Amino acid sequence: MFSRVRGFLSCQNYSHTATPAITLPSSGSANFAGVEYPLLPLDQHTPLLFQWFERNPSRFGENQIPIINTQQNPYLNNIINAAIIEKERTIGVLVDGNFSAGQKKALAKLEKQYENIKVIYNSDLDYSMYDKKLSDIYLENIAKIEAQPANVRDEYLLGEIKKSLNEVLKNNPEESLVSSHDKRLGHVRFDFYRNLFLLKGSNAFLEAGKHGCHHLQPGGGCIYLDADMLLTGKLGTLYLPDGIAVHVSRKGNSMSLENGIIAVNRSEHPALKKGLEIMHSKPYGDPYIDGVCGGLRHYFNCSIRHNYEEFCNFIEFKHEHIFMDTSSLTISSWR
């Protein structure tokens, strides 16, 4: 199986190589905006996490693993490759979809073939502690806007929130942040549950009752990788500013925070909790823009007067043993 994976990977014909001469941070501190943040460790046993939410399981065979695995997008092989390279780590795969019995058996077989792979069904986890009723969010925002002076009040936004409140009260008064995202399609739902899993950290593996996870400590962290991130070697022990880092996309002279990699050294990291607070306080919050980027910028006090490029460099997850964002070289097959 190892040779098949390696052979498959070698056929991808990527035109780039791993970023050369990366200097990985070691223990010490990192400075942003005049504040020193300790570089906290994620050791070699911190679990990795991949995620695959499949909207259309019928596009796979009845007894096939329902994760894309083509020459252009070898996502399943990337997961297997990570499990082979990082034998000492638990490799979580958070899945969701209306899978057939045969597809579930195929996922169970994957766990037997690679004992450090742990398939976790999203429906097996309890996210109620991170939930909030939409009506409460709307009512709080209505009160906040109505308390503003009339000359600065956003009447259009106020009207839209009142419409949303009326719709919720009419159709489903118990509708919540979690249940509403469960109805969403596309990357928004994908991103939302990723954030919640990372808030749980290692606790999610323990909650799911996965065999062989007894070595994970409650309250520990997790390293999320998009399935198009390709490992070429062990990650080792990582040192991150206050125990968190994310992927940074670089295109030409521009850069942006991305959620293709999110690494945290502990459950309920305060930056992600701040992002959840924003989601709880905004009428139309976004799990990427608010839950990740907003949470990071609030927690590390990165305001508009600070240099965004400097913040990206500060919070960036860097590693010479990862090919970053390989889907940008082909076409993402997630749909």
Swiss-Prot record:
Changing R184A: In 4RA; abolished auto-GlcNAcylation and reduced activity toward death domain-containing host target proteins. Belongs to the glycosyltransferase NleB family. It is found in: Secreted; Host Golgi apparatus. It catalyses: L-arginyl-[protein] + UDP-N-acetyl-alpha-D-glucosamine = N(omega)-(N-acetyl-beta-D-glucosaminyl)-L-arginyl-[protein] + UDP + H(+). Its cofactor is Mn(2+). It comes from Salmonella typhimurium (strain SL1344). UDP-N-acetyl-alpha-D-glucosamine binds at Q51, W52, F53, Y75, Y224, L225, D226, A227, S327, S332, S333, W334, R335. Disruption phenotype: Decreased apoptosis in infected macrophages, characterized by reduced CASP3, CASP8 ans CASP9 caspase activity. GO terms for cellular component: extracellular region; host cell; host cell Golgi apparatus. This is Protein-arginine N-acetylglucosaminyltransferase SseK3. Interacts with host TRIM32; without mediating its GlcNAcylation. GO terms for biological process: symbiont-mediated perturbation of host programmed cell death. The keyword Transferase applies. Protein-arginine N-acetylglucosaminyltransferase effector that disrupts TNF signaling in infected cells, including NF-kappa-B signaling and apoptosis. Acts by catalyzing the transfer of a single N-acetylglucosamine (GlcNAc) to a conserved arginine residue in the death domain of host proteins such as TRADD, TNFRSF1A/TNFR1 and TNFRSF10B/TRAILR2: arginine GlcNAcylation prevents homotypic/heterotypic death domain interactions and assembly of the oligomeric TNF-alpha receptor complex, thereby disrupting TNF signaling. The active site is at E258. Pfam families: SseK_NleB. Transmembrane segments: none annotated. Mn(2+) binds at D228, D325, S327. One of its GO terms (molecular function) is lipid binding. Its main location: secreted. Its EC number is 2.4.1.-. Changing R335A: Does not affect protein-arginine N-acetylglucosaminyltransferase activity, but impairs the GlcNAcylation pattern of host target proteins. Coiled coil: none annotated. Changing R153A: In 4RA; abolished auto-GlcNAcylation and reduced activity toward death domain-containing host target proteins. Glycans are attached at R153, R184, R305, R335.
